[in-house]
Amino acid sequence: MKIHEYQGKELLKQFGVPVPRGIPAFSVDEAVAAAEKLGGPVWVVKAQIHAGGRGKGGGVKLARSLDDVRKLASEILGMQLVTHQTGPEGQKVNRLYIEDGADIQKEYYVSLVTDRATQKVAIIASSEGGMDIEEVAHSTPEKIITEYIDPLTGLQAEQAKKVAESIGLSGGSADQAADVFQKLYTCYMDTDASLVEINPLNCDSKGNIIALDAKFNFDSNALFRHPEIVAYRDLDEEDPAEIEASKFDLAYIQLDGNIGCLVNGAGLAMATMDTIKLFGGEPANFLDVGGGATAEKVTEAFKIMLKNKGVKAILVNIFGGIMRCDVIAEGVITACKAVNLNVPLVVRMKGTNEELGKKMLADSGLPIISADTMAEAATRVVAAVK
């Protein structure tokens, strides 16, 4: 789960990380009122969407008068903001964040993320913060510093100070940054985050450290422990199909291809998508129905897949361990009739009650293409869309 910048800064403040004063706004008048309350004389008008690259995309602007705030808020609110993370269609801006202007002298980058290879939290920092951090990582990776944190001790003061000094900070600024890093680590752990990123982390002309941006991702499996974070959820920023899928406990992510995939198990789902690509096709989605699929659940899965008008064929790939193949077959038959399926359907089933499931499909009278192996299934579904 993702949250907006202003919500992330609320969290950072709770953990003692310094951030500029700011007020969210949902209309132009609210934006002007927020600027009046903050007092100025310089404000930053920021689009709030769940994507990076807002500055380059024209979603972050400096205002030097209340008239500027009104003009910029009118331009940004409601725009389709296109960044390198939104895709060409962009995302509609439904809310703004009006923030005090900052005394920017030097911008740094810092983030915390779980590194699965080392099974530790990594703190990643750079002396080259700001809008072009992706380019820095690509062209000058030596400017990206990574330290791994011992889960038994957490981020200690000396390790935090080492990171601060390695990105060029010194004296009181390095001490402040080290303190911020430790507070970020506490925030990361206590909120069950999967990513905390500050870009940029600013050092002003007095050497003070302040977070000018905040990006958070949270482990959805841990949200039951954090109702206060769930309250930050903005459904307008999420894919409607993914929201609908979550109502039926379906794991769904829409992709850019034309072959719908319905699979049980995340590992098998990824292997299925890889196999489709191996044989020259492009998956239209990731869809895991899990181990407790019912006929209703499979029907809803078909409906969600087919809302994507780019889907030209569907591949159902089931391994019947906990899930019985006859239950999936019943669901497939019910779904085909319910949605009046008019695209080719390839079904591959292996495992519990496999023969019964195959017989049910064969006796259904529906034009279902059967396959015994993943390679055969992928070959047939790719051929069906060409």
Curated annotation (Swiss-Prot):
Keywords: ATP-binding, Ligase, Magnesium, Metal-binding, Nucleotide-binding, Tricarboxylic acid cycle. ATP binds at residues 46, 53-55, 99, 102, 107. GO terms for molecular function: ATP binding; magnesium ion binding; succinate-CoA ligase (ADP-forming) activity; succinate-CoA ligase (GDP-forming) activity. Belongs to the succinate/malate CoA ligase beta subunit family. Binds 1 Mg(2+) ion per subunit. GO terms for cellular component: cytosol; succinate-CoA ligase complex. Its cofactor is Mg(2+). This is Succinate--CoA ligase [ADP-forming] subunit beta. Its EC number is 6.2.1.5. Heterotetramer of two alpha and two beta subunits. Transmembrane segments: none annotated. InterPro entries: ATP-grasp (IPR011761), ATP-grasp_succ-CoA_synth-type (IPR013650), ATP_grasp_subdomain_1 (IPR013815), Succ-CoA_synthase_bsu_CS (IPR017866), SUCC_ACL_C (IPR005811), Succ_CoA_ligase-like_bsu (IPR005809), Succinyl-CoA_synth-like (IPR016102). It is an enzyme of class 6 (ligase). The gene is sucC. SUPFAM superfamilies: Glutathione synthetase ATP-binding domain-like, Succinyl-CoA synthetase domains. Substrate binds at residues 264, 321-323. Mg(2+) binds at residues 199, 213. One of its GO terms (biological process) is tricarboxylic acid cycle.
